[in-house]
A protein has these predicted regions:
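Charged, low-complexity intrinsically disordered terminal segments
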Residues: 18-161, 165-496
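Positively charged n-region of N-terminal signal peptides that target proteins for export
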Residues: 1-4
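Bacterial N-terminal signal peptides
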Residues: 7-16
Length: 496
């Protein structure tokens, strides 16, 4: 379990100061945005959340102001400070009458079974686990059996990351619920990106959540842990709730610089709303299970299809940011066709020095020469980019600890006109196995804003430009390079 007392009090502050006098989210938007209500029926307002702080503030404010429902869907929900405080915020919402539904993929659940049961015991809260075949309620020998009896089922995961509030506002993007996705880890953080939405696209996001929630893949924790449930008393439920609330209310759990930052962020929500860009936008998603499952580890999906269609229409420029770069079958040839038509292709990805995934990097290392020979420009992120000073400008004590940064944002810009922000990595797993979500839209203002952000990430102070004569692998130890070499020997590319 990660450190329970890492600094991150944003959630607590906003919940504590906003709940008692909270308007509904819809009413607040009506009162603070003159023409938003009229636009929301047919258009979507969007704001790109580049910094972890503002993404967490947005989630916390919406959690504190929801009056009817909160639906969240995540791949990872850690038991660190962010994860625990978010859980406490959802419990507080349930206690004031909000219907709370949480859907989490099974493979990365690190909460204890008792904790899952205690949180789901509230009459207004429900927790379901997606594809529970490897972690929650699964014993060691059952895990072994599942791995060997149905390899695809073990590898088919729900990579979706969405949070929906009152059916009015939603957030999606690359961030999971853990400290490192919001720039609060003192050792290792992710350069990530989300997008805040209000309006029509949130209806599509809600429909996707309902489809997953009602699917055979989403199993209530009470069903998975039926035997343990019989041992949970009402007194234990009340005690766990008191512990969560007491932790959230105790200022000793939070670093001073975080409290100082909070005081300056509490007024940011209205300016954020005023900065939204309005247009027609599409929320793209996959069906539960990704596809019919009759093509082994292949088969594609709806997200894959729509992104390929968008890329195929490129005329001049494609700018991609993906932390993991392992081209699915036919991917390099597809990009070669675009390049032959005169399309410039640039890709921002992790270096060996920054990556959190040696297996995925080994797949990229095997393809790197072909990618460069095809004419693709590749930029590998530095572990200590100059940009981190901007990302952490309000947290000088974290800067002093010198944390590594790695890319985790999944974004795309086509011809400075079409953009995508979501969960899709440029690898076989996202193409064929994991369910993915994101926002795909044609809007020049947001596309240019996103392109400027990615282009900042690929500047020399933040990334290495990889060529046929140079790559930055020598920046790491021989031991780490050896791990890449060993992984390249394994037949694991379809699941990378």
């Amino acid at each position: 379990m990660k450190n329970f007392f890492l600094p991150c009090a944003v959630v607590v502050f906003l919940l504590a100061t906003g709940v008692s006098k909270a308007q509904s989210i819809g009413d607040w938007i009506d009162n603070n945005c003159e023409d938003c209500a009229g636009r929301m029926a047919t258009q979507t307002g969007a704001y790109i959340l580049e910094k972890g702080e503002e993404s967490l503030v947005g989630r916390a404010w919406l959690t504190g102001h929801a009056t009817t429902s909160i639906d969240v869907q995540y791949f990872i929900w850690s038991t660190d400070n962010v994860g625990i405080l978010a859980a406490e915020g959802l419990l507080s919402a349930a206690e004031r009458g909000v219907r709370v539904r949480v859907l989490v993929d099974d493979i990365m659940v690190d909460a204890q079974n008792e904790t899952l049961l205690l949180l789901s015991a509230h009459p207004n809260a429900d927790i379901r686990i997606y594809n529970p075949n490897i972690a929650v309620g699964v014993g060691f020998w059952e895990k072994v059996k599942n791995v060997f009896s149905d390899f695809r089922a073990i590898n088919q995961r729900m990579h979706d990351k969405t949070a929906i509030f009152d059916g009015v506002a939603g957030i999606t993007g690359g961030r999971n619920m853990a400290d490192e996705y919001f720039d609060f880890n003192h050792e290792y953080n992710f350069r990530d990106r989300d997008i805040l939405l209000v309006g029509a696209a949130v209806n599509e996001m809600t429909a996707n959540f309902e489809e997953f929630w009602d699917s055979e893949y989403a199993v209530p924790v009470e069903v998975i842990l039926a035997e343990e449930l019989a041992q949970v008393s009402d007194a234990a439920v009340r005690q766990r709730a008191r512990e969560l609330h007491a932790y959230a209310a105790d200022p000793r759990n939070f670093a001073p610089e975080v409290r100082q930052a909070i005081e300056a962020t509490s007024g940011q929500v209205r300016p954020l709303l005023e900065s939204m860009v309005w247009d027609e936008m599409t929320f793209i998603s996959d069906i539960p299970g990704k596809n019919q499952g009759d093509m082994g580890l292949g088969g594609g999906g709806e997200s894959t299809r729509q992104l390929i269609e968008a890329l195929a229409d490129a005329k001049q420029d494609v700018l991609i940011q993906s932390p993991y770069l392992v081209m699915p079958e036919g991917g390099i040839e597809f990009f070669e066709q675009l390049i032959d038509r005169g399309v410039r292709i640039r890709i921002s990805t992790n270096s060996l020095a920054s990556t959190d995934n040696i297996q995925a990097f080994s797949g990229y290392a095997s393809q790197r020469k072909r990618l460069l020979e095809a004419g693709i420009e590749v930029y590998e992120y530095k572990p200590y980019p100059a940009l981190r000073k901007t990302l952490l400008e309000r947290y000088p004590r974290i800067v002093e600890t010198n944390p590594v940064f790695a890319l985790h944002a999944k974004s795309l810009v086509i011809d400075n006109d079409v953009f995508y922000i979501g969960t899709f990595n440029l690898d076989p797993r996202s193409a064929n196995l994991n369910t993915e979500v994101g926002v795909l839209a044609r809007n020049e203002q947001l596309a240019l804003q996103l392109a400027a952000s990615i282009e900042q990430d690929i500047r020399p102070e933040n990334s290495w430009r990889t060529t046929q004569d140079f790559n930055p692998d020598d920046e790491v130890s021989r031991g780490k390079r050896l791990k890449v070499w060993l992984n390249r020997m394994l037949p694991i590319e379809p699941v990378l």
